[in-house]
Amino acid sequence: MRTFESVADLAAAAGEKVGQSDWVTITQEEVNLFADATGDHQWIHVDPERAAAGPFGTTIAHGFMTLALLPRLQHQMYTVKGVKLAINYGLNKVRFPAPVPVGSRVRATSSLVGVEDLGNGTVQATVSTTVEVEGSAKPACVAESIVRYVA
């Protein structure tokens, strides 16, 4: 876990790798809960029997579920001290190059693209994150997340 002592410390790290998460196993139960939360019950996600004969040979996590893992995975990599709160401001360049089969393990690696001073003690950080599937040549998700830190 990398600790930035302040938003100035964070800004000084622009262009650097900030960390890599632990491996996380994707379970069918988590996929089903995500399907319930989003209303996306497509068979490739929630019907293991049908999915076994489908294009991936098993059920797969939703792309948006993989994206939704970013906060969980990024919180393992770094923290910023001296801030009152961190606000998810949005995303850039989100792609899902490869599926995430249920039962597989994923982890993320993040780099700090840049930090912009917005004034009044607020900075906006752009973090590039790649989520990889263990044993896969292609990443499951590549995204830039934008976080505002209020000091």
From Swiss-Prot:
Source domain of life: Bacteria
Effect on the protein upon substituting residue 40 to N: 27% loss of activity
Pfam families, alphabetized: MaoC_dehydratas
Residues given in the record as substrate binding sites: 60-63, 86-89, 97-99, 124, 148
Record's catalysed reaction(s): a (3R)-3-hydroxyacyl-CoA = a (2E)-enoyl-CoA + H2O; (3R)-3-hydroxybutanoyl-CoA = (2E)-butenoyl-CoA + H2O; (3R)-hydroxyhexanoyl-CoA = (2E)-hexenoyl-CoA + H2O; (3R)-3-hydroxydecanoyl-CoA = (2E)-decenoyl-CoA + H2O
Site features described as Transition state stabilizer, chain residue numbers: 42
Gene3D superfamilies, per the entry: Hotdog Thioesterase (3.10.129.10)
MaoC-like domain location: 11-131
Molecular function via GO: 3-hydroxyacyl-CoA dehydratase activity; enoyl-CoA hydratase activity
Enzyme Commission identifier(s): 4.2.1.-, 4.2.1.55, 4.2.1.119
Annotated keywords: Fatty acid metabolism, Lipid metabolism, Lyase
BP terms from Gene Ontology: fatty acid biosynthetic process
Site, as annotated: Important for catalytic activity: 40, 45
Principal EC category: lyase
Record note on quaternary structure: Homodimer.
Protein family membership: Belongs to the enoyl-CoA hydratase/isomerase family.
Functional summary from the UniProt entry: Shows trans-enoyl-CoA hydratase/3-hydroxyacyl-CoA dehydratase activity. In vitro, can hydrate (2E)-butenoyl-CoA, (2E)-hexenoyl-CoA and (2E)-decenoyl-CoA.
Protein name, as recorded: 3-hydroxyacyl-thioester dehydratase Z
Gene from which this protein is expressed: htdZ
